[in-house]
């Protein structure tokens, strides 16, 4: 594991701990915490935010491409993807899942072609 990869997964793990602490049943206060408020509102509110953030990510990418921006010039994409990842992490936490679960799934798929991976899902029912 590279240092950058390790630091990235550490950030995700720390954020997962914070998200877990924001659940109302763990003392998160919906009056003081945006995340606690999302948890209190439930799946539909979280899913709505994911949809909004996904749309904003798409628009940032389209805008960057139209402007000929790539790399560091396309920082709006990174900003929007961070929002999207954050809200998907809220969803994961709401289902008792963590970023490690997603990383493990990505590791399982590593080295598989997309066609093989899709076929393996059909075999799983």
Curated annotation (Swiss-Prot):
**GO BP, sorted A to Z:** L-histidine biosynthetic process
Q: A Gene Ontology CC term for this entry? A: cytoplasm
The EC number of this protein is 3.6.1.31
Keywords per UniProt: Amino-acid biosynthesis, ATP-binding, Cytoplasm, Histidine biosynthesis, Hydrolase, Nucleotide-binding
Cellular location(s):
Cytoplasm
Main location group: cytoplasm
Q: Which GO molecular function terms does the record list?
A: ATP binding; phosphoribosyl-ATP diphosphatase activity
| Pathway connected to this protein | Amino-acid biosynthesis; L-histidine biosynthesis; L-histidine from 5-phospho-alpha-D-ribose 1-diphosphate: step 2/9
InterPro entries named among the record's database cross-references: HisE (IPR008179), PRib-ATP_PPHydrolase-like (IPR021130)
Q: Could you name the domain of life of the organism this protein comes from? A: Bacteria
Q: Which Pfam families match?
A: PRA-PH
**Top enzyme category:** hydrolase
Q: Which reaction does it catalyse?
A: 1-(5-phospho-beta-D-ribosyl)-ATP + H2O = 1-(5-phospho-beta-D-ribosyl)-5'-AMP + diphosphate + H(+)
Q: Which PANTHER family match?
A: HISTIDINE BIOSYNTHESIS BIFUNCTIONAL PROTEIN, HISTIDINE BIOSYNTHESIS BIFUNCTIONAL PROTEIN HISIE
The record's comment on protein family reads:
Belongs to the PRA-PH family.
Protein name, entry field: Phosphoribosyl-ATP pyrophosphatase
């Amino acid at each position: 594991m590279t240092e950058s990869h390790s630091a990235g997964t550490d950030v995700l793990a720390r954020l997962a701990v914070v998200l877990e602490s924001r659940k109302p049943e763990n003392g998160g206060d919906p009056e003081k915490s945006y995340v606690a408020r999302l948890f209190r509102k439930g799946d539909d509110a979280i899913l709505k935010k994911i949809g909004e953030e996904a749309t904003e990510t798409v628009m940032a990418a389209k805008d960057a491409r139209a402007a000929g921006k790539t790399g560091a010039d396309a920082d709006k994409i990174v900003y929007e993807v961070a929002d999207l990842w954050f809200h998907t992490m809220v969803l994961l936490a709401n289902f008792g899942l963590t970023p490690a679960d997603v990383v493990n799934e990505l590791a399982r798929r590593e080295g598989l072609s997309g066609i093989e991976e899709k076929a393996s899902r059909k075999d799983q029912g």
